[in-house]
Amino acid sequence: MMRFSTNTSQQREEIILVEAADPYDLNRFVQAQACDYARALDEVRKGKKQTHWMWYIFPQYDGLGITSESKTYAIKSVAEAKAYLSHPILGQRLIECCEAAVAVDGKSASEIFRFPDDVKLQSCATLFAVVSSAGSVFARLLAKYFDGMRDEKTVHLMAITAPTGDSNTVC
């Protein structure tokens, strides 16, 4: 049993995570965010990303990145994306960061995140828009910064790796 303390903008939480109940090793994100989450959220709110946290704050689908960080923090399936979004810490944080990005006025995604992180943002929003309901913050983020367009590489990778009968439509 592992114990992690987290600090959110609203309250201090203590969550006990049992490794056996974490088939996707989502704890890797919780651990990575332990020191950087508040800073990442602050940078997004200010409309200027300055430090390095993109991989574990806005994760992408597996197969998009080539660095060790992108591989470590890649989401490998639709089921893992759903588990991430349902996680009591990670889902809330992802939504909070996406809401913060949507709330930034007068800047493009490339002005806030710079290349290539603006592309990673579109990939992340695409991934989680697929596993969320219409009108989600992920769809709103895509609408605001990417003319509603999903990242084609993410859609393609999700389509070719999705098991037969998956309940989410990737297209």
Roles of regions detected by a PLM:
Residues 33-45:
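A long, hydrophobic alpha-helical segment
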Residues 43-78:
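Hydrophobic/aromatic-rich, well-ordered segments within soluble, folded domains that form packed cores
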Residues 63-69, 129-139:
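Short helix-capping/linker segments at secondary-structure and domain boundaries
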